[in-house]
C-alpha cells in the first residue's frame, strides 16, 4: 500500500505519518519546508520521542518526501492508495489544487483503483471541507469520476504534539505524548476498509468528534487562557494551579453533560475520560506553552469551535455553563505579540466593547443572557 501525507510538521511526522509507516505502508511526505524535505530524503528516517510514564524513542524509517507545490506530488496522487493531511485547517484550501490536478492525471491514466483521502485536522469534518475545495478546482467533466473513485473520509484526531525542544539541532526529531486517537468514518471509504493499527473505524463519527472537541480542545484552550492570565508559562503549570484546574474540570463536566444528553455516552466512562485528559495536561515531559495553545482566539471563539459550540449545547438542553463562560471570558483577554488574531481581537474589543465584539465573533445574540454573563465574567477578570 502506498500513501501520500501532506504536512511534514510535528503532527505529520509524530502522529499520522508514524502510524502509516509503522503499518508497513510506503509513505511519502509532501511539504513546502525544504530543510525538512532535504533531511527526509537524505536519511529516509527520523526519531520520535514518546513521553509519558514510560519514555521511549521510536525510529520511523523507509519514508520519502516531495515538495507539495511541484509536479512530483501530482504524479504521486495518480498512483497512491491513500492520501492523508496534517497541514492545519487554513492550509487545506491551498493543497486542494494539487490534489485536483493529481486526480485528473489519475483519471487520464485510467487508474480506477479506489483512492481514499483523510484530512487529519483539528476541526469538525475537515475532509468534507477539503472535498469542497477539491471539487471547486475540478472541471465539471471530472467531478463524476472523482465521486465514483475517490473516498473523502472524515476523521477525529487526538494527540498532543508540542514543538520539539531539540528542533534547533535536528529538524526531524519530534516529541509526542503516549496517548493517541485516530477515529475515521468507515461509511465514507471507497473499496475495502484499510487495516491500519492505531486507526479506529466508526459509523458514528460525530459523537467522537464532539467528544474530543468538547473535552480535550475545550479543556486545553481554557487551561491556556486562564494560565496566560495567571502568568503561567506551560499547560502543566496552569493545570497544577488549583483555581484554574477547578474551572477547567468544571467546564469539561458542563460540556460533558451535553455529550451525555446528545449521544448517550456513559456518565462514569466520560468522567474517567475527563480525568485522563487532566492527566495528559499534567504530563511533565510535554513543554506545552500556553501561548501556543491559546493562539488564534478568533477561530476558537467562533460558533462551531471549542468554546461556543459546547456553550450552545448547554443552552439547547438547559444545562449549567458557568465555567464555560469563565473560559470564554479568559479567551477574550488573550493577548500575544506573536499572534495576529490576538491583536485583531484586542482591537475589536477596544473599538466595539466586549458585548458587541463577542457577539460578532461568536454569532451569539448581543442582547442574550449568556453574552451578558460572559461580559460580566470578562469585566471581573480585568
From Swiss-Prot:
A GO-annotated cellular component: cytosol
* Xref: InterPro entries: 6-PGluconate_DH-like_C_sf, 6PGD_dom2, Mannitol_1_phos_5_DH, Mannitol_DH, Mannitol_DH_C, Mannitol_DH_CS, Mannitol_DH_N, NAD(P)-bd_dom_sf
Provide the residue positions that the database annotates as binding NAD(+).
3-14
A Pfam family: Mannitol_dh_C
Q: Which controlled-vocabulary keywords does the entry list? A: NAD, Oxidoreductase
Claim: Magnesium is one of the keywords in the record:
no
Q: Which NCBIfam families does the UniProt entry name for this protein?
A: PRK02318.1-2 (NF002646), PRK02318.1-3 (NF002647), PRK02318.1-4 (NF002648), PRK02318.2-2 (NF002650), PRK02318.2-5 (NF002652)
The name this protein goes by in its record: Mannitol-1-phosphate 5-dehydrogenase
The protein's organism comes out as: Salmonella typhi
Query: Which gene is this protein's source?
Result: mtlD
